[in-house]
Regions:
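Active-site loop segments of alpha/beta catalytic cores
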Residues: 1-145
Length: 145
């Protein structure tokens, strides 16, 4: 959960976020919101704030990709959800391949999905698993034009 209540977020944080997003849009830029943890209590305000993307979508924090996609639809691009807590450090390349395939099945419909780690590619991530994530994304993640 966020460190502050949704009410305080709306009062003290989001007005400034909106100004940043609006200015970026005036400059022709896209804006991705990076916010760790469980974002459900802020999801509606984040969607209304005009962000183009939401990152990192941590499965260990309750941000199941299929559920987030069902809720958000095509209103925002989703980035992340390949577990960097256990899977990328300690899993096998085959397990990573399976997780990427599942993420794409869960959230690629209609576009708006960028596969990446659920937070970062930190020093504990097994390089072979990082490569497996990239390769699986290429294998399963192309859209037919």
């Amino acid at each position: 959960a966020p460190l502050i209540s949704p009410e305080h977020f709306n009062t003290f944080i989001n007005p400034y976020n909106r100004k940043l997003v609006d200015r970026a849009r005036q400059l022709g830029l896209r804006v991705v919101r990076h916010s760790d943890g469980n974002l459900w209590s802020l999801m509606d305000v984040l969607l209304a704030s005009g962000y183009d993307g939401l990152n990192p979508l941590e499965p260990h924090a309750g941000m199941a990709l299929k559920k987030v996609k069902a809720y958000c639809g095509d209103r925002i691009c989703l980035l992340g959800n390949i577990d960097c807590v256990e899977l990328l450090p300690d899993g096998t390349p085959q397990q990573v391949d399976t997780a990427v395939k599942q993420a794409i099945e869960d959230a690629a419909d209609g576009g708006g999905l960028i596969i990446c780690s659920s937070n970062s590619l930190h020093p504990g991530v097994n390089p072979e698993n990082c490569i497996a994530m990239f390769e699986a994304t290429k294998k399963y993640g192309s859209y037919e034009a």
